[in-house]
Amino acid sequence: MGRANDPAILTPPTVHATPQIMAKAPSGKPLSGKQRSETNETIRFLLKLALIVFVFRSFIIAPFSIPSESMLPRLLIGDYLFVSKWNYGYSRWSLPWGVPLIPGRIFGSVPERGDTVVFRSPDPEPGDTDPAHDDHDVIKRVIGLPGDTIQVRGGQVILNGKPIPKQRIADFTLPLTPNFDATHCESDFQDTDAAGQPICRYRQYRETLPGGRSYRVLDQRDIPEADDTGLYTVPAGNVFLMGDNRDDSADSRFAAPRGMGYIPLERIEGKAMVGFFSTDGSAEWLKPWTWFSAARWERIGEGF
């Protein structure tokens, strides 16, 4: 081992030259017992660390970032959340990359209406090669449980035959930033604030579910296919999910590939727990001070 790469071996050696040359070639020296022990300890430590991270992320808490505006006004692009993994049980989708190590669903429970959940999107339709339709993690709000009937009429959700109260409240305004620029806000909704800064302004409402749980939603305009739907009956083992930004959310109101249809309970990965960071996207790597000015500090620590 090591001699074939040592140029000194190519010279005519004497019987005693080889051990002398080996002693002088650091690359040819065998590891000492201490070095081997340290290397093995490092490998064992890294394996243990990887196992701890795998278990923690799969079964306790995992991070999640918000990539789109479908959950405005509650969640902004650039928000980072912790998601609790134990609320609804575990399935293969609880594990990184959906590794099929868990058969079916264990310790399962049904979410409550109004919960904000992270789930794995349905598999793309056969022949669908659009990368946007690849399975990925998504966040939406639970509106319907197994057996519920749901319909949207005139932009109002009808749950089990009764309209969910929808109260008009103050407009939702959001500054235009690199994370949410003019391409995300149509010209009809662009405005300026008191300081003359560009903002996006949407009509905002408060919905209140049976039992008193409430949350804010946006209604940008009248869109017939989103605001006036057929009657849905949620199948057993599934839930009906909607984005809070009702006119800009691909959710259970629409079948794939436009939406997602009903979501099987086993695809739910966890429940949104708390925001741990938020950025408006203006940070630059070569300007460290912008790492702080870009942070939306007031959003850190907001719970659900």
PLM features: residue spans?
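Hydrophobic membrane-insertion alpha-helices, especially the h-region
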Residues: 41-61
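Soluble "head" domains of membrane/secretory-pathway proteins
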Residues: 2-39, 60-65, 70-304
